[in-house]
Amino acid sequence: MPMTTTSTFETHIIEAYRGPVFGETIYGANVLRDISAVFTDVVGGRAGDYEKVLIRGRNAALAEMSERAKQLGANAVIGIRFDYSTVGRSMLMICSSGTAVIANPRIPDASH
């Protein structure tokens, strides 16, 4: 399913708006990953394990949002936004939102 953070598709015409859609995921962090991240913060560099959790969570939120868009009869989602927050001391919540739409490919102008 085509998805974009913009409010339009350059290559598609939006025929109908089906409504807002959301995807939510919550991931727990483990102690070893926390210790590794603290060490990375002190030494410098990237916390690869946390980045993997963020990517997995973001992809899961997008997949959930895509399924909800399909349930509304949509074939695309526009205006996607993400929100990240912590729940308690060891949980990460990732929420995505967007607008489900029916979008059809633009037909190229034959005169050009």
Curated annotation (Swiss-Prot):
InterPro entries, sorted: UPF0145_dom_sf (IPR035439), UPF0145_YbjQ-like (IPR002765)
Pfam family, one: YbjQ_1
Domain of life, per lineage: Bacteria
Gene3D superfamilies per UniProt: Hypothetical protein apc22750. Chain B
Protein family per UniProt: Belongs to the UPF0145 family.
Protein name per its UniProtKB record: UPF0145 protein RB3016
